[in-house]
Amino acid sequence: MTIALGRFTKEENDLFDIMDDWLRRDRFVFVGWSGLLLFPCAYFALGGWFTGTTFVTSWYTHGLASSYLEGCNFLTAAVSTPANSLAHSLLLLWGPEAQGDFTRWCQLGGLWTFVALHGAFGLIGFMLRQFELARSVQLRPYNAIAFSAPIAVFVSVFLIYPLGQSGWFFAPSFGVAAIFRFILFFQGFHNWTLNPFHMMGVAGVLGAALLCAIHGATVENTLFEDGDGANTFRAFNPTQAEETYSMVTANRFWSQIFGVAFSNKRWLHFFMLFVPVTGLWMSAIGVVGLALNLRAYDFVSQEIRAAEDPEFETFYTKNILLNEGIRAWMAAQDQPHENLIFPEEVLPRGNAL
């Protein structure tokens, strides 16, 4: 019996092959298939943000000035969220709210959903770009895996949290002072700093900063003196094959300092990857919990005792009172559409009053 081995031949001008060849060609700025998602989305997200912070008011959604045109600066300008009455509408330009009127669309907060959605897909496109390039040059995909952490935080804070609340209104607006307001809101209404997922996130981010500082200093400290240049950067050839620092010396140093030390580079660098990525993912999970109004730690026994005994107070009970103050002062200012009015006697006062 005769068996013929072979493969099907494609047409020379196959459209997919032509596109693949052009997109993945070696050029100064790599495009790739991921670029079809990344570049348009990043362009629209950044363009929408610059347009909103320059020209668009938040008077109709928050009762605020939020653009350079109205007198804001870089720290106070923002692309603000839509009004609470619009709930979770995508606010498409051609939708029933704006009906194709660009000015009305901006006034309603359409730029926020535009920036948020294009920003999310732009970040995903950037992660796919790292996957694609890693595959092209036969690297492992850990860069892309690491970048999933900030994507998780962005999606949880800007998309999932407001989806769990009554509308996009409760998401952060895109601006520096606006993010600060959102942080205060998270503390006052969710007691976020006492949430264990926030604690893990802080440990991850600050732990990663500590690891970076220690790692950079250790490598600098153990560089081989194999050149006669005046400083670190002149003393080495960037294309040299051998390593430029002594892992053995570093291991001896930290073994004497702490009693333990990393014995190989793979475990050391994986740990530097693991700490911040895990911390950010834990924060993202915590924010998803807040979207469902899950509570942080409650030390009820301390609250009861503080209520019964005026002389008993802890940092926890003080923070609970501060949160009540944030809610009382912030709700009326932050949600003008609710027409909230708090009697003077329920507003928090300083001890001197």
UniProtKB/Swiss-Prot annotation:
Catalytically driven reaction(s): 2 a plastoquinone + 4 hnu + 2 H2O = 2 a plastoquinol + O2
GO annotation terms (biological process): photosynthetic electron transport in photosystem II
Coiled coil spans: none
Membrane topology: Multi-pass membrane protein
GO cellular component, one term: photosystem II
Family to which this protein belongs: Belongs to the reaction center PufL/M/PsbA/D family.
Name of the featured protein: Photosystem II D2 protein
Native source species: Liriodendron tulipifera (Tuliptree)
Underlying gene: psbD
